[in-house]
Amino acid sequence: MFLLLRCSVTYPKLLQIEDNTKCFATYFYTIYLAISSEMLKFAAIFENIMADSAKTEQQFKDVLTECRTLFQKKLHDYGASWRILRPSSLTDQLYIKAKRIRSLEIKKESLVGEGIRPEFIALINYGIVGIIQLEKGYVDEVDTSDEALQLYDKYALEALQLMTRKNHDYDEAWRSMRVSSYTDFILTKIQRVKEIEDIQGDTLVSEGIDANYMD
């Protein structure tokens, strides 16, 4: 409808032409040009969206690769010693990491030389470890590093797939968020997990601990 109105405003004299055939031919040709122009604009926008989505998915993969590389190196050094940890202990570790990020954001300096980025990587890895512990349970004897890495890959892939689906639905709105907002959001999630743990998982409407770890 807005195309018809625009054409009528642009070419008001068309309605006064005696040759009706020429009038309508010119009129609808104008509409055709207008629609074609809009379709080209839409195609360009759609192409940009697809390109951005592909770029975002690759960025997700690059970050997970970086996290996995560090996780694998620590498996070499320490083994899968984290398999001994109960989920509540992992929640506390996540809390400490997130609190340190917020502290650094506020103070604008670190006295121990480690910045915010390593802590975000640690949050990702501990989150995956938490999901593993929820599913497999904690143990007294650690698993082999190969088995631990297989479990890591399984849940890292699930997290990637969830992020991709959410990115589709939210149309990359997260890119407009401040990093400090992510920190607060993560702390909120961790606090929810602590509350759920305190009531032994007996929730009424809330998502479980695993969903919060995945987020």
Predicted regions and their residues:
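Zn2+-dependent cytidine deaminase-like catalytic core
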Residues: T10
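Short, positively charged and aromatic/hydrophobic N-terminal segments
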Residues: K13-L14, C23, Y29-N48
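Intrinsically disordered, low-complexity regulatory regions
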Residues: F42-D215
